[in-house]
């Protein structure tokens, strides 16, 4: 996994050092936010790193497919990988009593927990509003907001379905669920 990321980084570095530096800072900031959120949640140790690794694996596998090769540019892949750690950033607004609760959440607690997706979208918009990289900003927003949408339309926060859900949010959702059941 990491050699692939490293190779991708080297390619960007050779193409444009300024973009490589910006990508590095964006990646470090995303990882920092994610670590801050994860430190509040006793139940997710390593979740951020694992889901980022799963997203990386899926994107690299998809890039080998003829259909996705046309859709997945190197910049897009880099942006999705860098945005992946931010998918749960909205949990920073979730009370500790819910984040750290052992056992099953009540219906009311679950409703509060579900707000982390919409909260994450807002946090991304506010935090990165002045970032020149509009593509990263949009991808990060959509990954945070839509990673709990379901293909059948029964997800949250917006009840999007099928192709209404951005590809990167669907990829993040698969990584998130896979990590939860592993």
Describe each PLM feature range.
Residues 28-182:
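Histidine- and acidic-residue-rich, metal-dependent catalytic cores
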